[in-house]
Amino acid sequence: MSQTSTKVDMLNGPLFMKILIFALPLAASSLLQQLFNSVDVAVVGRFASSKALAAVGSNAPVISLLINLFVGISMGANVVLSNHLGQRDDEGVRRTVSTVSLVSVVSGVLLMLIGIGVSRPILELMDTPADVLDMAVLYLRLYFVGIPFFLIFNFGAAILRSVGDTRRPLYILVVAGVINTVLNLVLVICFGLGVEGVAIATAIANMFSAACIVVLLRREKGALQLQFNHMRIYGKELRRMLQIGVPAGLQGMVFSLSNVVVQSAINGYGSAAIAGSAAAVNFEYYCYYIIVACNGAAISFIGQNYGAGKYDRVRRIFRICMLMGLVGCFAANALFTWQNHFFLSFFTADPEVIRYGAIRMQGVLLFQFMACSYEISGSALRGMGESMSPTIMTVFGTCVLRMVWVFVVSPHYHGFAQLLQVYPLSWVLTGAMVLVAYHVRMKKLCAVRA
């Protein structure tokens, strides 16, 4: 397949099919990355023990907390590249590619060192039960050894997404997913390595993905080509990336921190609740990545059209992305919740673990489509270069509410199901605020143009 055939003209022509063609591979790519973690959870749950399942699953909020800042910066890179492309600024594209590439390497090494260093303290702070603590620490440290490669792939994929190429990163992840699955089974079943086996398998799969994305960028033509001999960090592009990416990343970090607080409360219900919640969360991630795909489409398409001054198309792009997110996410939410025992049985045969997992799916997963309201609205605002306002509203409406719920409300209503009610409540509150902010922004844009 030629490089041109993988790219999308975002500035001209009908939008619906272009957005769909862009979003489907992006959703599949995100789902495959989540599959790495799901395979880890399923293999240890089925072939090791429920405690090993709890050890791997309890790390998800910690991993999200530590990587979200850098994932946010990659989002900023996508916006900056999209704006330059919309303005037909090849030199700006070239400088941004160079900056993004170096930032991904530096960020990856920094995050690896931080992750390895804080693994035990942060898991102890979360009240991780003593019977799973050592396994959880081991998994987390080994996971972070591979994190530089994870970030190199994600920053590289952001470069390709800015021109509409979501298919080639998907092809890489398909192969990486097969590598991860095979290594998981070999290391856990044949060599009896348990949690360390699944962490090593994930790290090797991330190495493969990073190597492939670098090769693709080296083979690009024109301004998008990665040139090692001309690599440097350009201050203007870095500042713009950070202006957009850091608020988005901090939002993700605070968001994850609130989930760490909720996870700490879940830990108080014992290892069966931890394992059940860990299994159920996998399906939340699968559904969430439908929203992520629509977010990515909104950022790239709106970024280019905003850069080109095509505000009517910006409004249409937002509506299409919101519709796709709501319909797709709700359909997946309903399917997984309807057959919750069947899907949970992929991760464990323990009936008590399945019971807790089903409670989470019925109380949280079924209502997850509501998150589209603030996720896609926030992505639309970021595509227009406005990152701070959706961050502030999301931090307040989602993160602060969850912390207040755990520390103030939940102690008066003892129960696993009652604890989880905070998720749909926070989605409704945050969605209302960010939707209003988007419509205010569009009104101002149209007024200026008039």
Predicted feature residues:
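Short alpha-helical transmembrane segments in multi-pass integral membrane proteins
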Residues: 1-23, 81-146, 179, 190-246, ...
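N-terminal transmembrane alpha-helices
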Residues: 10-47, 61-76, 80, 105-112, ...
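Residue-level signal for transmembrane alpha-helical positions in Major Facilitator Superfamily
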Residues: 20, 24, 36, 73, ...
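Transmembrane helical elements of multi-pass membrane transporters/channels
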Residues: 21-40, 142, 176, 205-209, ...
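Helix-terminus/linker motif at the lipid-water interface of multi-pass membrane proteins
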Residues: 31, 35-54, 123-130, 186-193, ...
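Small-residue hotspots at the loop-to-helix junctions and early N-terminal turns
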Residues: 48-61, 140, 199, 271-286, ...
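Small-residue-rich hydrophobic transmembrane alpha-helices
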Residues: 53-113, 150-169, 263, 276-334, ...
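Short runs within selected transmembrane alpha-helices of multi-pass transporters and secretion channels
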Residues: 74, 142-161, 169-180, 198-213, ...
